[in-house]
Each structure stands twice: as C-alpha cells, then as structure tokens.
C-alpha cells in the first residue's frame, strides 16, 4: 500500500472546476479573493454599452461597484467550493499510524501526520488518541525534535503496553543530548547519571522500580549453558535468549560478565596460594618440625604441615564460595 499526501488523491479539476453556470464560476472566483474586480468590470462594461463614453464610464464604475458588491456569496455557498477534506475518523487515523509505525516508515508517517486533513471537530479526539500521540512521539524522536517528544510524553498518560518503547525513547533522547553536550560517547556511569538527572515521567512509568537481576530459573539455565560452552556463538545466544526470555545482547553480556568474574576469582586464588606457600616452607624449616615426608604420613595429622594444608583448604573453600556468590548475582546486565 502506497500512502501519498491527501492532496494527491484529487485531480486538478477539483481545484479549478469547469462549471457551465457562470454564476457558480463567479462564486468560485469570489471565494479566491481576486475575482470581484474582474466580475465588477464586466458588469460595468455591460451597463455602459448604450451611452456615450463618459456615461459609459460612469455606468461602468457603478456597475463595477454593484458587481463587486453582488459577487459575495453567503458562507454556506462558498463552503461548497472550498478545498475538499477527507472525513477520517480518529480510529482510521490511528490504524494508519499503527501500520506505518510497525513497518518503520517514519518519513511517510511524518508526512501523513503533517498533511492530514480531518473533519471539523475531530482534532480534539485525534489529539487524545494514544496511537496517534505515540506516532507523533516516534516522529519527533527520529527527527531529533526532542522538545516536542518530551512535551508529548510528559503531558499525556499512556497505557502500560506503550511504556517500554516510550521509556527507551525518553532515555535515548537524553543520552544523545548529553553526548552532544560533552562531545564524547557516554559510558555506563555517565548514562546512570543521566537517568538519575532525568527520571522517567509518571505518564510512561507505573512507579515500580525496574530490577536488573535475573530470576533464579534464568540464572540456573545460563549456568548450565556456561558450563558446556563459556563462549557461545550467535546462534546459541539466540537459542538461549528464546529459552530464557532475554535478548541476545543480554545473554552475551551475562556470559561476558561471568567469564570476567571467573578470571578474577582464579587470579585471586593464585595469589592466595602464592602467599600461603612461602609461609608453609618457613614453618617446615624451623627446628623441631617434622619433615615433609612425615607430614604426609597418617601419624602426623596434627603437625604444622597439616595445619597449613587445612588453611589452604579453607582458603580454597573461601575462594570458591566467593566465586560462586559473585557469579550468581547477575545484576545490571
């Protein structure tokens, strides 16, 4: 379906009708504002044709005056020859807006909203329709007219079904303004500050705090896949996204964060082993301490070597607990 300006729906004869009745033709010229003088001059010429030139001129002037005064028609007659309008109902306009918004044709959607003729009295109903308001917000966002976008979002209450898209546009618009002001891309901390400075208006937010933590079932499924393959390819990310209800980007961020946590835990574990190793060697070198061989025998369970090994086990246990705890708190993905 091709949408064009409503003016394209009318041929040129609608603009300049070829009426056989000269009276209707004069009414059309009068409605344009420039035909009264011509029709008056014609009446003057007709009235002064039988006299002399002076009398003819006078009659022409009188005829011109009478012609100029008589060419005006009542408003109800002039309304017949004004530019025709399309009697679109608010529901029809909303349906077109929804279709263009879903197809992503923002340019055509903007032209449709700009050149839309409506029936008298329908403007108020159209301005209250959510689909039309959302379409205007989308056009304002994509054209960079953020002031109009903020005005629409702050002054009209939207249903929960529209909150997600409108919230994303609100935040992205403020991000772009902040980037333009600072002259550089925003980092995570910068975006956090922008969100704090420009909170979501209650017209597109139900007041509930949005949590960035995943549910336990989602985390469990992600851990299972992580143990099988810490580096999933894009197809596996899409498959896992469908299984968990997340987006492929969220899945990729979770795997990336989990790998970083595991690397940090492994590095901390190595540092603890390096710190425990020299102290254990010094304790073995002291007089009166059993040899390393006797430390491995069952009869030396209470030896200093055993205490060092138990300390190592406790350190390893603490590291593993720390690793699991930090890896399982998948927030801010």
From Swiss-Prot:
It is found in: Nucleus. Induction: Represses its own transcription in a TLE4-dependent manner. Induces in lens by PAX6 in a dosage-dependent manner. Activated by SOX2 during forebrain development. Inhibited by MTA1 in mammary glands. It holds the Pfam family SIX1_SD. Residues 73-120 are annotated as: Interaction with TLE5. GO terms for biological process: apoptotic process involved in development; brain development; camera-type eye development; cell proliferation in forebrain; circadian behavior; diencephalon development; epithelial cell maturation; eye development. Residues 233-235 are annotated as: Bind to RHO promoter. The keyword Transit peptide does not apply. Residues 207-266 bind DNA. InterPro entries: HD (IPR001356), Homeodomain-like_sf (IPR009057), SIX1_SD (IPR031701). Belongs to the SIX/Sine oculis homeobox family. This is Homeobox protein SIX3. It comes from Mus musculus.
């Amino acid at each position: 379906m091709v949408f064009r300006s409503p003016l394209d729906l009318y041929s040129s004869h609608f603009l300049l009708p070829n009426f056989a009745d000269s009276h209707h033709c004069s009414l059309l010229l009068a409605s344009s504002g420039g035909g009264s003088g011509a029709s008056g001059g014609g009446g003057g010429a007709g009235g002064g044709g039988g006299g002399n030139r002076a009398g003819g001129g006078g009659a022409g002037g009188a005829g011109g005056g009478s012609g100029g005064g008589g060419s005006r028609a009542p408003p109800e007659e002039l309304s017949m020859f004004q530019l025709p309008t399309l009697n679109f109902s608010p529901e029809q306009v909303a349906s077109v807006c929804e279709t263009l918004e879903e197809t992503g044709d923002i340019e055509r959607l903007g032209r449709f909203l700009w050149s839309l003729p409506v029936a008298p009295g329908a403007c108020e109903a159209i301005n209250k329709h959510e689909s039309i308001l959302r379409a205007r917000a989308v056009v304002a966002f994509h054209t960079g007219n953020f002031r109009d976008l903020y005005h629409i979002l702050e002054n009209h209450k939207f249903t929960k079904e529209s909150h997600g898209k409108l919230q994303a546009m609100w935040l992205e618009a403020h991000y772009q303004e902040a980037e333009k002001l600072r002259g550089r891309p925003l980092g995570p901390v910068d975006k956090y500050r922008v969100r704090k400075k420009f909170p979501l208006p209650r017209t597109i937010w139900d007041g509930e705090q949005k949590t960035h933590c995943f549910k336990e079932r989602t985390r469990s499924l992600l851990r299972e896949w992580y143990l099988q393959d810490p580096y999933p390819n894009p197809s596996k990310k899409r498959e896992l996204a469908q299984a968990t209800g997340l987006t492929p980007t969220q899945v990729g961020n979770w795997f990336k964060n989990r790998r970083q946590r595991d690397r940090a835990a492994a590095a901390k574990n190595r540092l603890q082993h390096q710190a425990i190793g020299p102290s254990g060697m010094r304790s073995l070198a002291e007089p009166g301490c059993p040899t390393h061989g006797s430390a491995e025998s069952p009869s030396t369970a209470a030896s200093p070597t055993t205490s060092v090994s138990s300390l190592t086990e406790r350190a390893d246990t603490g590291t593993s607990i720390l690793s699991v705890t930090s890896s399982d708190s998948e927030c801010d993905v």
